[in-house]
Curated annotation (Swiss-Prot):
Family listed: Belongs to the glutamine synthetase family.
The species this protein was found in: Cricetulus griseus
Chain sites annotated for binding ATP: 134, 203-208, 255-257, 319, 324
Binding-site residues, L-glutamate: 246-247, 319, 340
Disulfide bonds: none
Domain GS beta-grasp: residue ranges: 24-106
Record PTM Phosphotyrosine, positions in chain: 104
Residues bound to ADP: 336-338
Pfam families, alphabetized: Gln-synt_C, Gln-synt_N
Name of the molecule in the record: Glutamine synthetase
Every GS catalytic domain range: 113-373
Source species, domain of life: Eukaryota
Subcellular location: Cytoplasm, Cytosol; Microsome; Mitochondrion; Cell membrane
Length: 373
């Protein structure tokens, strides 16, 4: 089982320095989505005092030609802070700062999907859209092999590992526990976690978050996971089908509700939203992974608890459907529905924006509507 060389270094030496006092100064780590639409980058600056809100944080810049976001001849890109969290690695008063990215002309970068999403969420704020996203991931060794899998074969068949207990059923629970606690410390709205169906696969849930905050919290939770995995010397992949063959893929099931859906007889509004989604399936498939559906084509096969990528379906307690209505929601006739098609490597801003456009703004067709300022 290959782990990184840095994970074998003496961590006690680092702690000797991390315990030094830092006076009134604060380290703020700025985090952003790079030009791939999947990767995260970060850099740290020193502030003279602890910021009390995100508005007190200064804008910054970076070399976009090194992150697939600009040409080297015009490489300066701008970081605009939009969300602030406690830093679980350096601890208080230090901060994690999630940022939007803007070009030299102050237009949003191509992978800054938050900018448009924020505008769409503001348009429906009176409906109080809530989201919860279930982030699946697979642990790999530094050689790209699933962590804990035999080097020359496969583990036992699926069925033993979901919510599994024991060294032969749940690999690297310590990573999950460290990530969970780090998210709680940071103020990320993490609500649960468990071992998934495939060996070395885990899931954590973020939410419920209202509107734009869903994407902020999920991206920062992903960042924290990558940092935790680095300390343990392994890799977390959000690939939608990291292991070909008879193994589960990885999704990011997205739960959605509005105020009216959560109220008495809200099931009526849930069914109306599902009907709208059924007429716009191709648009949503394109929005549900960063490659416009190509990643999900490997995952949404109609097998391994997925629907077929080409067909829309919905049902109560049906995990092979595009949309699942939880049984308790069907019984209570109010609550939420689960969109099961988003891939594990989706951009949460793209997913939540698409759902709102179709379900609340009543858009139709294969392209998003362009609203005037």
């Amino acid at each position: 089982m290959a782990t990184s060389a840095s994970s074998h270094l003496n961590k006690g030496i680092k702690q000797m320095y991390m315990s030094l006092p830092q006076g009134e100064k604060v380290q703020a780590m700025y985090i952003w989505v790079d030009g791939t639409g999947e990767g995260l980058r970060c850099k740290t600056r020193t502030l003279d005092c602890e910021p009390k809100c995100v508005e007190e944080l200064p804008e910054w810049n970076f070399d976009g030609s090194s992150t697939f976001q600009s040409e080297s001849s015009n490489s300066d890109m701008y970081l605009s802070p939009v969300a602030m969290f406690r830093d679980p690695f350096r601890k208080e008063p230090n901060k994690l700062v999630f940022c939007e990215v803007f070009k030299y002309n102050q237009k949003p970068a191509e992978t800054n999907l938050r900018h448009t999403c924020k505008r769409i969420m503001d348009m429906v704020s009176n409906q109080h859209p809530w989201f919860g996203m279930e982030q699946e991931y697979t642990l790999l060794g530094t050689d790209g092999h699933p962590f804990g899998w035999p080097s020359d074969g496969f583990p036992g068949p699926q069925g033993l590992y979901y919510c599994g207990v024991g060294a032969d059923k749940a690999y690297r629970r310590d990573i999950m526990e460290a990530h969970y606690r780090a998210c709680l410390y940071a103020g990320v709205k993490i609500t649960g976690t468990y071992a998934e169906v495939k060996h070395a696969q885990w899931e954590f849930q973020i939410g419920p978050c209202e509107g734009i905050r869903m994407g902020d919290h999920l991206w920062v939770a992903r960042f924290i996971l990558h940092r935790v995995c680095k300390d343990f010397g392994v890799i977390a992949t959000f690939d939608s089908k990291p292991i070909p063959g008879n193994w589960n893929g990885a999704g990011c099931h997205t739960n959605f509700s509005t105020k009216t859906m959560r109220e008495e007889n809200g099931l009526k509004h849930i069914k109306e939203a599902i009907e709208k989604l059924s007429k716009r399936h191709r648009y949503h498939i394109r929005a549900y992974d960063p490659k416009g559906g190509l990643d999900n084509a490997r995952r949404l096969t109609g097998f391994h608890k997925t629907s077929n990528i080409n067909d829309f379906s919905a049902g109560v307690a049906d995990r092979s459907a595009s949309i699942r209505i939880p049984r308790t929601v069907g019984q209570e006739k109010k609550g939420y529905f689960e969109a099961r098609c988003p891939s594990a490597n989706c951009d949460p801003f793209a997913v939540t924006e698409a759902i709102v456009r179709t379900c609340l703004l009543n858009e139709t067709g294969d392209q998003p509507f362009q609203y005037k300022n």
